[in-house]
């Protein structure tokens, strides 16, 4: 689950708890629980986060699931996404790809980019649903168009390999570049490979080396290997 602390702070502010109040975790918890028990979906989501993150209360995944579910059943996309993640990871509930898929889909249909990306990966890998590259492409595109760098990279991969769509190196390059410019190390490596092989763009070893170097800095070992190779060749 991404950015729990940021999500928690934002959720508490949305409930009207000011900086001085939500600095006190125990006070946050009491106030949030009171609102959650009154049926406030945002508070239910926030309470789920608090249990999930162990903020103001002892960490308890089962309680997190309980409160995420209450908010999710009221249509809260963030709670649907987090509930899907609990099922996906088997935290506080038995691991269940089909249930993860069901909740991700509900959040994705409301425009939640993270859920759209996860739905894409589940369609691509056949997790909780029959493998379907065309559906994977569809959901990756939705997330990519919202700026999700992981989705942009995966969309590029699908265009590069012709999965769910006709192979198109120019489109692959476009999406790799968008992700790479956001700092996505795997996309930086993939963009370097496109320049190295001349796929969708004129071959350029200097630019290839530059992107491999960025990927290396981001922790992609093969980027380091390719950077050293090109450096030895004098590029």
Range-by-range predicted roles:
Residues 9-18:
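Bacterial N-terminal signal peptides
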């Amino acid at each position: 689950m991404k950015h729990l602390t940021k999500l928690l702070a934002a959720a508490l502010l949305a409930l009207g708890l000011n900086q001085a109040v939500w600095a006190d975790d125990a006070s946050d918890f009491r106030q949030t629980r009171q609102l959650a028990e009154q049926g406030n979906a945002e508070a239910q989501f926030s309470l789920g986060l608090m249990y999930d993150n162990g903020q103001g209360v002892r960490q308890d995944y089962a309680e997190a699931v309980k409160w995420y579910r209450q908010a999710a059943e009221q249509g809260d996309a963030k709670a649907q996404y987090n509930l899907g993640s609990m099922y996906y990871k088997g935290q506080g509930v038995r691991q269940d790809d089909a249930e993860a898929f069901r909740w991700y889909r509900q959040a994705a249909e409301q425009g939640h980019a993270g859920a759209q990306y996860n739905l894409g990966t589940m369609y691509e890998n056949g997790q909780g649903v029959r493998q379907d590259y065309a559906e994977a492409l569809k959901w990756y595109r939705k997330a990519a168009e919202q700026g999700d760098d992981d989705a942009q990279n995966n969309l590029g991969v699908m265009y590069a390999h012709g999965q769910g769509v006709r192979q198109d190196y120019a489109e692959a390059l476009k999406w790799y570049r968008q992700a790479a410019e956001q700092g996505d190390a795997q996309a930086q490596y993939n963009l370097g490979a496109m320049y190295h092989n001349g796929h969708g763009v004129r071959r350029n070893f200097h630019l290839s080396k530059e992107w491999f170097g960025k990927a290396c800095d981001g922790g992609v070992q093969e980027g380091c290997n390719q950077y050293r190779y090109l450096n030895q060749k004098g590029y």
